[in-house]
Amino acid sequence: MQTSLHENGPVFNIKNFSGPLDLLLSLVKDKNIDIFEINLVELATQYLEIIKKLQDDKIDLASDYLVMAATLLQIKASMALQGEKVDEEVELDKERLLMKLAEYKQFKEISQILRYQEEKRKEIFLKKSSPAEEFIRPIDEKILDGRSSMVQLVLTLRQMFERTFAEKLRRTKIDNFNLTPSDQVLYIKKLFNENEIVTFEMIFSLPSLSHFVITLIALLDLSRRQELLIYQDQQFGTIRIEKGPNYEE
């Protein structure tokens, strides 16, 4: 069932969203603005209006939507009461929420890339190839030289992960981790406190897709900022990670 926030406004179907962060991210995208530049009071107001409208229409909402509504209401009320001089604790709550939203955005983007690659791989398996095509491989497609694109890094690291943990993945149950990409940034940097060069196996140490995606987001962020450089000299060869020019201890 779809509900409209305003008579001529956008139509929302709560089933289109995977959770409150997904709904918030959609509202941010509509404003076409960076997450950390968003007016949180305005965003909170819009979110709360949607939740109220859904409740008025007697639509069942998962508890996490209501928890987020309570969180936003508290932050909004605190910011309104304190005016320009916002309490440090309120500011921290605001930063935590925006950071969580930014991390969710990264997670969603990576998941979409992985999903796209999965579909492309299925197409390749279904496609009937000629004997000659089986031996053709695009030049340097799987070589990492420290300046590879984000997409190439994702695809290569995903392939290496599946190759390394192929057997264990078949026996591993779906799991939930409380780790965040920020936690994994600290973990990766801890490895560099003890090693000049870190390998793929040292970073991706668990046969879990959830752990892989969370750690991948952390590694890609460090690579994007050129804190780390990622190398692989040949397809399925050792992937090594080294400190980049912008590395911060």
UniProtKB/Swiss-Prot annotation:
It comes from the Bacteria. Keywords: Cell cycle, Cell division, Chromosome partition, Cytoplasm. It is found in: Cytoplasm. One of its GO terms (cellular component) is cytoplasm. The keyword Cytoplasm applies. Pfam families: SMC_ScpA. GO terms for biological process: cell division; chromosome segregation; DNA replication. InterPro entries: ScpA (IPR003768), ScpA-like_C (IPR023093). Participates in chromosomal partition during cell division. May act via the formation of a condensin-like complex containing Smc and ScpB that pull DNA away from mid-cell into both cell halves. PANTHER family: SEGREGATION AND CONDENSATION PROTEIN A (PTHR33969:SF2). Component of a cohesin-like complex composed of ScpA, ScpB and the Smc homodimer, in which ScpA and ScpB bind to the head domain of Smc. The presence of the three proteins is required for the association of the complex with DNA. NCBIfam families: PRK00104.1-3. Belongs to the ScpA family. This is Segregation and condensation protein A. It comes from Mycoplasmopsis pulmonis (strain UAB CTIP). The gene is scpA.
